[in-house]
């Protein structure tokens, strides 16, 4: 099963655990934190994986989880290596965003913009950015 975008290209997808995938769909989470960088920039679909993250109840109460489905699309516009100053700035200026990720110097902040909800599509997730 493949999804094609408006240009006829196969789409790129990133699997993210709930509640974080739904928080992206709701435009509450705009930065995905990862241990690795990516050179990819462009349209990216978000897949809510089957496994749930261990998070505080405050975040879980905000969403209706949609496990095992592609739930929204966005644009991956940048990938920033986190420094101590970057982490401090996010914690001070964006406290909700800070709660939605693992912010540590040496990790990467994937910057997401232009989020659009889509009709959910069942899919089996994969690691890294994958084609669907």
Predicted stretch roles:
Residues 4-132:
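Structured alpha/beta reader/binder surfaces that contact nucleic acids or chromatin modification marks
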Residues 1:
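Glycine- and charge-rich intrinsically disordered segments
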């Amino acid at each position: 099963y493949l999804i094609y975008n408006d240009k006829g290209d196969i789409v790129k997808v990133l699997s993210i655990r709930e509640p974080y995938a739904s928080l992206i769909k709701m435009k509450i989470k705009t930065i995905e934190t990862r241990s690795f960088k990516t050179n990819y920039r462009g349209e990216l679909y978000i897949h809510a994986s089957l496994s749930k993250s261990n998070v505080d109840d405050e975040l879980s109460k905000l969403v209706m989880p949609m496990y095992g489905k592609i739930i929204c699309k966005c644009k991956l516009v940048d990938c920033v290596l986190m420094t101590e100053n970057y982490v401090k700035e996010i914690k001070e200026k964006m406290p909700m965003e800070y709660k939605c990720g693992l912010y540590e110097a040496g990790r990467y902040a994937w910057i997401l913009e232009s989020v659009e909800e889509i009709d959910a599509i069942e899919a089996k997730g994969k690691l890294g950015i994958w084609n669907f």
